[in-house]
Amino acid sequence: MLRECDYSQALLEQVNQAISDKTPLVIQGSNSKAFLGRPVTGQTLDVRCHRGIVNYDPTELVITARVGTPLVTIEAALESAGQMLPCEPPHYGEEATWGGMVACGLAGPRRPWSGSVRDFVLGTRIITGAGKHLRFGGEVMKNVAGYDLSRLMVGSYGCLGVLTEISMKVLPRPRASLSLRREISLQEAMSEIAEWQLQPLPISGLCYFDNALWIRLEGGEGSVKAARELLGGEEVAGQFWQQLREQQLPFFSLPGTLWRISLPSDAPMMDLPGEQLIDWGGALRWLKSTAEDNQIHRIARNAGGHATRFSAGDGGFAPLSAPLFRYHQQLKQQLDPCGVFNPGRMYAEL
């Protein structure tokens, strides 16, 4: 097992050498999410040695850690203080890291009610494309005007710089949590979800799977109990939400390519080409399909959303419009002028 260690100087030296030699770098943690995006060829920059919790004072509701720190280590520290990561990030592997969580920017079933990974990032330390090790943001939540590089790194898949340290806001764990299951049709489920979203219910999870609506209630004991009586259904183990988050439900073993389709919260039922599982109260559709990539991207775009293929290769991320592509291109050129950070991971031209 790797010890806590500040390995930033060695990482900085390797980056500067790569910039000097114009050698592409493959930024790597535990590889738990390596299946996302296009394969990158280059010299490996392994950040797993750069690990350890730098600062955590539960009274401040902020934790700062080096990027190679295992996510399970972070969550264990938070749990011991009765706190949690509000965005409920997936691991997809026992060694998933703090840095990989932010680089991929994926959130779990609680996302619509608590917020995204980006919403809770307060500050970072980053090795830039100029070969400098700089700090952005801090450990307090504040309004940010202009260029917010810390949050820009969320979901950038390591293409804009090397994260070395991340500060995030955390929240207390709910005092009560209860999961329910109701066997109803998809049409009935979507209708009820739309109605519930107009009410102050302590909902933190809504998923339609296996001909049933799965509901998670979290909050004060009184509000959870009242909502349970109002919504009905049978009480089930809360383990379901972890299995959903980690893609361990039987749905994810079905044949076909797995797609993640993000949609507006009020998106209606959709006739998708394959089997689907509905999460985020309808705003996220997991799809197992053998349809062509272009067809899936087109369906998502026409519904006001975007699709991501959950397997390696070209065409996994939603195609960019010409103006948006130019913006990405300019951003990459400004932050990584030598093109050494995970070139082509998201798009071949970037």
Swiss-Prot record:
Location relative to the cell: Cell inner membrane
Gene name per UniProt: glcE
Disruption phenotype: Abolishes glycolate oxidase activity. Is unable to grow on glycolate as the sole source of carbon, in contrast to wild type.
Molecular-function GO terms, alphabetical: D-2-hydroxy-acid dehydrogenase activity; FAD binding; glycolate dehydrogenase activity
pH note: Optimum pH is 8.0-8.8.
Job of this protein: Component of a complex that catalyzes the oxidation of glycolate to glyoxylate. Is required for E.coli to grow on glycolate as a sole source of carbon. Is also able to oxidize D-lactate ((R)-lactate) with a similar rate. Does not link directly to O(2), and 2,6-dichloroindophenol (DCIP) and phenazine methosulfate (PMS) can act as artificial electron acceptors in vitro, but the physiological molecule that functions as a primary electron acceptor during glycolate oxidation is unknown.
Induction line: Part of the glcDEFGB operon, which is induced by growth on glycolate, under the positive control of GlcC. Also induced by growth on acetate. Expression of the glc operon is strongly dependent on the integration host factor (IHF) and is repressed by the global respiratory regulator ArcA-P.
Alphabetized SUPFAM superfamilies for the sequence: FAD-binding/transporter-associated domain-like (SSF56176), FAD-linked oxidases, C-terminal domain (SSF55103)
Record bears the keyword Cell inner membrane: yes
Pfam family, one: FAD_binding_4
Enzyme class: oxidoreductase
Main location: membrane
Catalytic activity: glycolate + A = glyoxylate + AH2; (R)-lactate + A = pyruvate + AH2
Protein name as catalogued: Glycolate oxidase subunit GlcE
Native source species: Escherichia coli (strain K12)
EC assignment: 1.1.99.14
